[in-house]
């Protein structure tokens, strides 16, 4: 969830900047080719900037302490386990870090398979057995090995481009409609036009977030499958069962709930980056 939050936050900022820059430059929505190029530059630009700084940002915002020299047997075991799983997955050893949080959480981030970070919370280390922790680590290493950070960045870039492009096309149509029905033919005016674009950016942005969340849920199932291969199905199921017994998702800040969020039903599930734990456990048992 952490990587999704950082992507979405950065991309909403990019949408706002795009709106301002386009208005200043007077980009004409009737010039579809130019608008599409402009939208793609901003759409993918925001996503790749977010990806490039993801590891640095995670360390700063989460207060991650990277293990360079293990201080005790637990840290040594963490590093050795991640190293073994990374070698088995055919990727370079990710950095391993611990951050202070009472919640049982973990996340993986980084710009590429061979430049990644796997971090676990102190709450996870003290709240799970070693087998369960191994399952969690395998899940995060699988995210890295599957290239999920890059995959979601590309998806986010596509939907960002759609949001920027579609919002301005629709705003242009509204402006032309108002202009045709206005005796003076002035249309919306600059500030009203910017307000319409901003509202459309937000509406299309919500739809885009649902699309990204949908693909993220698919990647979670894939990471669970990968974890089952790396650590064993029973260890992964045990980790998910432990998370299910923990606090409800409402007790966790959304941007920190990087692993195993208990999903809500109906429309709320469409915005979840992770499937409900029950579905993940059932998928593993049936695999």
Curated annotation (Swiss-Prot):
It is an enzyme of class 3 (hydrolase). The active site is at residue 140. GO terms for molecular function: metalloendopeptidase activity; zinc ion binding. InterPro entries: HtpX_protease, Pept_M48_protease_HtpX, Peptidase_M48. It is found in: Cell inner membrane. The chain crosses the membrane at residues 4-24, 33-53, 154-174, 195-215. It comes from the Bacteria. It is a multi-pass membrane protein. Its EC number is 3.4.24.-. PANTHER family: PROTEASE HTPX (PTHR43221:SF1). Belongs to the peptidase M48B family. This is Protease HtpX. It comes from Shewanella frigidimarina (strain NCIMB 400).
């Amino acid at each position: 969830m952490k990587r999704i939050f950082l992507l979405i936050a950065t991309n909403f900022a990019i949408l706002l900047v795009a709106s301002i820059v386009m208005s200043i430059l007077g980009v004409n929505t009737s010039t579809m080719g130019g608008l599409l190029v402009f939208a793609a530059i901003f759409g993918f630009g925001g996503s790749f900037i977010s990806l490039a700084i993801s590891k640095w940002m995670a360390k700063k915002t989460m207060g991650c302490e990277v293990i360079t020299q293990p201080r005790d047997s637990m840290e040594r075991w963490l590093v050795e386990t991640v190293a073994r799983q990374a070698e088995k997955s055919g990727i370079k050893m990710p950095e391993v870090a611990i951050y202070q949080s009472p919640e049982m959480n973990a996340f993986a981030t980084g710009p590429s398979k061979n430049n990644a970070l796997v971090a676990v919370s102190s709450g996870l280390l003290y709240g799970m057995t070693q087998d369960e922790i191994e399952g969690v680590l395998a899940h995060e290493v699988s995210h890295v090995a599957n290239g999920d950070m890059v995959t979601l960045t590309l998806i986010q870039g596509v939907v960002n481009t759609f949001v920027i492009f579609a919002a301005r096309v629709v705003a242009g149509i509204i402006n032309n409609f108002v202009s045709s029905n206005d005796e003076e033919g002035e249309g919306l005016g600059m500030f009203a036009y910017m307000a319409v674009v901003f509202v459309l950016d937000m509406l299309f942005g919500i739809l885009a977030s649902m699309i990204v969340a949908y693909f993220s849920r698919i990647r979670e199932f894939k990471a669970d499958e990968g974890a089952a291969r790396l650590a064993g199905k029973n260890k992964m199921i045990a980790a998910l069962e432990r998370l299910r017994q923990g606090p409800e998702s409402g007790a966790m800040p959304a941007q920190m709930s990087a692993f195993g969020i208990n999903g809500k039903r109906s429309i709320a599930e469409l915005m979840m980056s992770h499937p409900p734990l029950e579905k993940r456990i059932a998928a593993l048992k049936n695999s």
